[in-house]
């Protein structure tokens, strides 16, 4: 296997996450602008003006850029849909991710590459064959197992099922991140409860709440093991990514456009390393254990294998929010970087910072820097800790920009 045959696709909801993904070695990024994307409400979406800047950054870095246009589209949305795809064409975005045939057809008409969204729930080779007239990359349903994926891949190869560009259709699958309790994300709970449609990018995440179960006739509350009965654990595939590669998956999609840059960086880096390791023969239990430990440090609701290995019932989280082994605490902001010395000046605005603390620095150009504090200087003197109100300097291995944010990682207490 050649590592260049595979692609890590990173989620991007901010410039910090964009630069973090690029730094981690992502091959492509996906993002949304304003409306018509499945994270229109939950992530900090970009504007049409951002589209051109993101496309330029990605081209300069050799990274593909994918724009999501994958919500349910009504007649009154057609003009907006066309204007968004027109902007994608002008910005030279690599492809759009679509689920509505209207978006696919229009993109094809004006020469914009199309990739298919998980919202289509493509679960068999014949459905893929039909949609191949529109798309060069197809994401398969998250409910499939690896035997089913392999069958679809073998059909593509045997029948030479090609997309509009004339190349065999590439299979994309989710590799890591949040899962929906509904099939391929087609959920109506949010619409029913809050008149806020998940299928229009406005999911209120009410499945993540805790619930009690009562007998309607007797009024008795049932004793259930877990109150989070509709909130799945997060998908993690790094311990069997070799099986996915062997089954024909070529694009590995990471969920998390609403997550921070440290999440994007850590997850992308781990999966990139795993793919490279399998290709060069160093994929083993020791490496998997190291990646598992790193993945546990960033946002997660606990992990499971999804349905990929044949499991038919979901696994549900036992908590609300993140179960990461550590949390980031805001400490201060960047003031100046002294490149010759490799030292950054920060203003401490909250809490304390100690020698030995692990920190993360984030910014729209910086992306993310993760390192330990080896030395702290305050008024030219070495000190053991820094406190609120002080301007301090610490060695930093990369350039820090004014107003970059400084966080301290703390161990999360259960």
Curated annotation (Swiss-Prot):
From the Swiss-Prot or TrEMBL record, what is one GO molecular function term? peptidase activity
Which cofactors are reported in the record for this sequence?
a metal cation
Query: Keyword Cell wall biogenesis/degradation: yes or no?
Result: no
Q: List the disulfide bonds.
A: none
Top enzyme class: hydrolase
| Protein's GO biological process | biosynthetic process; proteolysis
Q: What is its EC number?
A: 3.4.-.-
Keywords of this entry: Hydrolase, Protease, Virulence
> Which domain of life does the UniProt lineage start with?
Bacteria
PROSITE patterns for this protein: PEPTIDASE_U32 (PS01276)
Function summary: Has collagenase activity. Hydrolyzes type I collagen. May play a role in virulence.
**Which protein family is it in?**
Belongs to the peptidase U32 family.
Subunit and interaction comment:
Homodimer.
The name this protein goes by in its record = Collagenase
The opening ranks of the lineage are: Bacteria, Pseudomonadati, Bacteroidota, Bacteroidia, Bacteroidales
Protein encoded by which gene: prtC
